[in-house]
Amino acid sequence: VKIAVLYASSRRGGNSERLAEVLVEGMDVDSLFLTDYRIEPIVDYRHTEPGSYPEDDYRKLLDRVLKQDLLIFATPIYWYGMPGRLKLFIDRWSQSLRENRKEFLDRMAGKRAYVLAVGDDDPHVKGRALIEQFRHIFDFVGIRFAGHVIGRGNRPGDIEQDAEALSAAREIRKRILAEMDAGSHR
């Protein structure tokens, strides 16, 4: 199983990153820190003659994502949604849909994804919209939504106090490792 973690936070060492570290401990993963990529906003050519798309790191990042079987989105909850960097990346999927819809959807189909979201202000309630947004995105492109964990944290390290979120991440880790082990015995 090829696994990538997409880290959406604007800072390294934050709570969503730590929660992801707990989940993927001991696994070989492709760590994709969105702060390492320059992703420009989508140029909407749906109803016009196509022009050129931005020259940025979108394709490089997308190529790494498309090689994976399992995607883990580790994100803070910013204003009840995902951070701008992650939204820009997903918005650009519209570019891939326009360029070669069938190929893009075929390559996305069959992937699984987990969402790890961390916020401070009643995240289990105020993070619901973010989780629903991911459900709709995954449904549209054919990714199976495997589950999510919502944790509480604001300052770096706060997630360490959320025993429920840490436990949930460890349970997902056990499931993934069991699936990987079962797959290696076939």
Residue ranges, per PLM feature:
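A short, mixed-charge helix-start or loop-turn motif at secondary-structure junctions
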Residues: 5, 54, 116-120, 155
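Short histidine/acidic/glycine/proline-rich micro-motifs that form metal-
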Residues: 10-13, 77-80, 120-124, 154-157
